[in-house]
């Protein structure tokens, strides 16, 4: 559902055969796959081995990751997947012209150290792209996600809020890491599901409702999500939530 965001960023930075792209918190690799399809040489880092296994499948890796020891997986599409975060030596040697941090669920405090390392060690002039939710009033999904915070509250479970929805939050994060803002934009990314059950399942898969499930139970959380989705159900039974995401281009 974030494909419009990925495509817009790739178009704006002319990602293609001459691009070496590094993705922070690459997740299950959809943005990497789209960049590789344009001919870019891509490298992705993530803390979650299970997500990297999904990314390897998407990149048509010739071998399985197995237990995924720290290190690289090189695929036939010039893709390299690594656990953790890039070390300064990797950033200096990689020659990356584009660095992305496009997962809006990554908290700013988690992302900040990696961005600081990029600012200190990546190639001067490299583009660094950050993304986050747009204004809450423009994001239907943000209203539904409030259910997670409310249900998790009784037991004090930590619920990461939608990241970087303030007007200058992306710029503040970039400047705080030593990067220079150099342009921004907004992209419409509607969340669409074939029915209510698919919408509930899809939202639960984000992990943002895990603390709510721990504080209550799965059935209660599913019930509350379904109720919150009611305003977004269409006459044909599908569910559609209009959302806006914002991206910032900064320079090393």
Predicted regions and their residues:
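Conserved alpha-helix/loop element of class I SAM-dependent methyltransferases that forms part
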Residues: 1-20, 30-34
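Short, well-ordered alpha-helices that flank and scaffold nucleotide-derived cofactor binding pockets
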Residues: 11, 33, 37, 57, ...
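A generic alpha-to-beta junction signature in SAM-dependent methyltransferases
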Residues: 13-15, 36, 115, 121-122, ...
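Class I SAM-dependent methyltransferase SAM/SAH-binding core
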Residues: 20-89
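Conserved Class I S-adenosyl-L-methionine
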Residues: 28-30, 165, 171-252
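A short SAM/SAH-binding and catalytic strip from SAM-dependent methyltransferases
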Residues: 96-112, 134
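Conserved catalytic/acceptor-binding region of the Class I
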Residues: 112-113, 119, 125-194, 210
